[in-house]
Amino acid sequence: MGEMVRIAVVHDEKLLRSALVQLLRSDDTLDVSSHCLDADGPELSAALPADVCVVDGECLTGPEDAGAGRLRARYGDRLVVLATAKRPGVLRRAFDGGALGLVDKNAPAHRLITAVHTVARGERFLDETLTVALLKGAEMPLTTRELGVLTLASQGAPIAEIAARLHLSRGTVRNYMATAVRKVGARNRVDAIRIVQSAGWT
């Protein structure tokens, strides 16, 4: 037997995390551990000594993206991100963040194992089924500021709070909101939030 490859599995949902661990342990060259990103807090990076980290792309979303930052700080590009073509924004963030592996959640189990070994060698792995979605993610029409305004609005923040948190005037926030609604082809603010969330841009 060759040298073992240490794998850390990160997922917010216990059942799915356990299923991923069992799948990966079917390969006896993989030494697998698992953790919940939220529960481990800032100590996460020190707690997971591994060669490759397998993480659900949905764990890397959010306005602060703090969990993604901790994982990248610990593993660099040795990330295998699980994603779907329905969420091009999630794919784009993972790719732009330097993750070497992008695996379709609908792919056969052996694809994940292949991806892990590929990334462990420092090589890129991209499921062909995700290629078009990855390109769509690059077409996200909103600026960082417009996306930030919509993200805060999606959390229920009123105009005044958004203005205070982003150090903008209320009028400027309204302008950003109106521009974002127009750019994504939405009917209103609620529709714009739905569109960007469905695409995985927030």
Curated annotation (Swiss-Prot):
Subunit structure of this chain's protein: Homodimer, in the absence of phosphorylation.
UniProt induction comment: Transcription about 8-10 hours before aerial hyphae formation commences, peaks at 38 hours just before aerial hyphae formation starts, decreases rapidly and stops as sporulation commences about 70 hours. Not autoregulated.
Protein keywords: Activator, DNA-binding, Phosphoprotein, Transcription, Transcription regulation
Superkingdom as given in the UniProt entry: Bacteria
Keyword Transcription regulation on entry: yes
Functional note: A transcription factor required for aerial hyphae formation on rich medium. Activates transcription of ramC. Might be part of a two-component regulatory system. Binds the promoter of ramC. Non-phosphorylated protein cooperatively binds multiple sites in the ramC promoter. Has not been seen to autophosphorylate using the small molecule phosphodonors phosphoramidate, acetyl phosphate or carbamoyl phosphate.
Record PTM: May be phosphorylated by an unknown kinase, probably on Asp-56.
Ranges of residues in domain HTH luxR-type: 135-200
Cystine pairs: none
Result for mutant: residue 56 to N: Does not restore aerial hyphae formation in ramR deletion mutants, does not bind ramC promoter, forms homodimers
Annotated effect of mutating residue 56 to E: Restores aerial hyphae formation in ramR deletion mutants, does not bind ramC promoter
Pfam families: GerE
Reported consequences of knocking out the gene: Deletion of ramR leads to loss of aerial hyphae and sporulation on rich solid medium after 4 days growth; by 5 days aerial hyphae and RamC are expressed. Deletion on rich medium leads to an initially bald (bld, no aerial hyphae) phenotype; after 4 days develops a substantial aerial mycelium. Wild-type mycelium on minimal medium. No expression of SapB, normal expression of chaplins. A complete chaplin-negative plus ram-negative strain (deletion of ramR or the ramC-ramS-ramA-ramB operon) leads to the complete loss of robust aerial hyphae.
Region of interest (Response regulatory), residue spans: 1-121
Result of altering residue 105 to A: Does not restore aerial hyphae formation in ramR deletion mutants, does not activate RamC expression, does not bind ramC promoter, does not form homodimers
Annotation: DNA-binding region: 159-178
InterPro entries (UniProt xref): CheY-like_superfamily (IPR011006), Sig_transdc_resp-reg_C-effctor (IPR016032), Tscrpt_reg_LuxR_C (IPR000792), WalR-like (IPR039420), WH-like_DNA-bd_sf (IPR036388)
An MF annotation (GO) of this entry: DNA binding
Species in which this protein is naturally found: Streptomyces coelicolor (strain ATCC BAA-471 / A3(2) / M145)
Free-text note on domains in this protein's UniProt record: The N-terminal response regulatory domain is atypical as it does not have conserved residues usually found in these domains; it is required for both homodimerization and DNA-binding. The C-terminal domain does not bind DNA alone, nor does it form homodimers. At very high concentrations overexpression of the C-terminal domain has a dominant-negative effect on DNA-binding by the whole protein.
Biological process (GO), any one: regulation of DNA-templated transcription
Membrane-crossing residue ranges in chain numbering: none
The protein's name in its UniProt record: Response regulator RamR
